[in-house]
């Protein structure tokens, strides 16, 4: 593709003479030059103004010249020379990746004009003029404008590279293309863009900026000229078959149009599809009634821009000519006014819906100047009178199609618990956020580790109260294991260490479903109490020595492995040798003890070392503390093993009860094989330090350090990881479906305010935790019900996947509305479902879709981004239902009568060619 450069900003400015002698005599003195240029640089940025780039080297030389104060100095800079900023002196393209302050300085137009008039511009260089543009939240000089490749539909091989500002309108691109390609004034033209995927998008709105149109440097823009016979030559364009949603021959049902996912924007698509299928709101935009009510001066609004963007979207989706559309213009408009929706992160469809309804209301508010309105005082007055006054006050400041369609009225009653003072207010609402009845129980999956080493750990599923404590978990597990709750310690194990050791009073809400929870059978306490005779429970880690990568260094690293242990040790018999023996006993299921043959084989050739050990009895106690314990001779060990094994449930090794093991003479004449050494460590399993047994009682974490060869020969990793499943593992907590009316009843029940949100009682003159009750007083034409599926607490976040059963027709609110009933108009309280926003997945990720009933056909459809398919009514109810849209029956009946009396014009019956469709056939 041939590219022809054309930079409309590159017109040369008449320059003064290049040398100092030809400078005009009107050049001011140096101080005045410095003041004029320096003051100009401090000028604030204003959108649309021109600034100019000056090469940093020339500017610094000029700066030194004027600061020197000598007008005849040799530092005279000469003509402005920006050659270092250009790639070459033919195309005059700006070099890439120039940095302000390092490569150039920016000057506003007045300062630039001064310098040019004083010093001139070298070699007929074009001035580097750039515009100030306004981006969301910031103004900046657009040093690198957008470069677009303009082509004609009749010649896709020859492209013109044209620079534009991101703040320029699409219409400027169109007019530039018409000028460059010599299009006659009477000829019709339109633009298309080719995106990175190769498909083409129609640039329908020519009044928006290139930034809002999401155009990028290097993007291909195609100008299409209408044929003389009135048709468009779109079919001849390269790549048209990549646009299945832009088919001029496609004539479908209005409203059955998908929305392309721009990247995690399914939440937006779902909210838009629901709102688009609210009949009275869509008719309001399709019939252009919104044009008469746009409020451009509302300081709380978006200058009408959000309403206009939504109107364009509705008109496209209800034109009947699109299978799907790309809502990038609307997305950019939302991000422009609500920074939380900038980018392409996942958000909540209900949050976007709330912003959209509020934004549309303010953009379409019929009240141009809001007056101050005092709050109603309902003390001692009839509810009917107070409610009517509250609604009238609301309408005096808020009057729009959104209020007409979606706003209702609450009655809020607060009662002081001390003096009984009652406060009644009536407040408007736009939607109901109703809680789901939460199950008071939860199922926890835990591993029970018995003291008997012959038994493998057991996997259990226990039912516990959601708001219970760790003690409730121990009681529930006790029914499965027959172990007393006070003989259990609950731990969160993560990465081979104890992440947390729980106290009995700790809340269960601190345990997440993904946590690995181990419950250990013990006979004592972890934190010793002075004077207590209880056993000490010692946390024990397993570590393997690994050679350092520096082979000239004798240092060995240590890596945790396996599951940590909690070992009960008698307080008055705590010793290294006793701890070693009890650990050997606890590990006996998956650790093989060395035999006499192993000892003999390993000690051959080392007799001299054994003799040294035997003779050095005077220093044996010191060695014991430094290197950890060794084993007893074969006879004594065997007796202790048998006693330990026969101790049964206590799991307590009798060797700890033998006073002789606490003396310094316990090592035998001949040392036996030592499988591991013991070290005191911190809770992370690090920070080794030599510690006496007495000190170990105050720093109870112990590590068993294994040599790699010892671990390989004697430690059975497969057996160590083994466990059995208890019969309760298959238990699943049954979740019964919930009726929508149960949620509404829960919404209207009395609740006590939380400590973080007290109420100020005008009678007590204090903040009180009052009781609060909400009642429905007046319902809107379209009632939006938000099911609060997402639960947040201090320790956890979860999504409730409870099935909420809701009626498609005849949802009767008469039992919830406390306003005196109009018996002659029962339809005022009955509603029919028209749309559902669904959420699939969990808290961190998920996907939004929509069920919606077409206002013209009455057929339900499933909208999944750009995919749309018809569905039966029995498919609508699911656990994914998140936001429900109900329409009052009297409104629906009135709309049906209006529609039947009118003759709709369908796309199929229209003979006028659609100017927004590109033929792909």
UniProtKB/Swiss-Prot annotation:
Location of Phosphoserine modifications: 596, 692, 906
Keyword annotations from UniProtKB, A to Z: Acetylation, Chromosome, Cytoplasm, Hydrolase, Nucleus, Phosphoprotein, Protease, Thiol protease, Ubl conjugation pathway
Protein role: Protease that can remove conjugated ubiquitin from target proteins and polyubiquitin chains. Inhibits the degradation of target proteins by the proteasome. Cleaves preferentially 'Lys-6' and 'Lys-63'-linked ubiquitin chains. Has lower activity with 'Lys-11' and 'Lys-33'-linked ubiquitin chains, and extremely low activity with 'Lys-27', 'Lys-29' and 'Lys-48'-linked ubiquitin chains (in vitro). Plays a role in the regulation of pathways leading to NF-kappa-B activation. Plays a role in the regulation of DNA repair after double-stranded DNA breaks.
PANTHER family in alphabetical order: UBIQUITIN CARBOXYL-TERMINAL HYDROLASE, UBIQUITIN CARBOXYL-TERMINAL HYDROLASE 11
GO molecular function terms noted in the UniProt entry: cysteine-type deubiquitinase activity; cysteine-type endopeptidase activity; transcription corepressor binding
Identification of the protein by name: Ubiquitin carboxyl-terminal hydrolase 11
Positions of region (Disordered): 1-29, 592-697, 893-921
Residue ranges annotated for the DUSP domain, each copy included: 28-133
Compositional bias segments (type: Polar residues): 657-666, 676-697
Lineage: Eukaryota, Metazoa, Chordata, Craniata, Vertebrata
Gene3D superfamilies the UniProt entry points to: Cysteine proteinases, DUSP-like, Phosphatidylinositol 3-kinase Catalytic Subunit, Chain A, domain 1
Bias (Acidic residues): 597-624
Subunit structure: Monomer. Associated component of the Polycomb group (PcG) multiprotein PRC1-like complex. Interacts with RANBP9/RANBPM. Interacts with BRCA2. Interacts with CHUK/IKKA. Interacts with NFKBIA. Interacts with SPRY3, RAE1, MYCBP2/PAM, and KCTD6.
GO CC annotations, alphabetized: chromosome; cytoplasm; nucleus
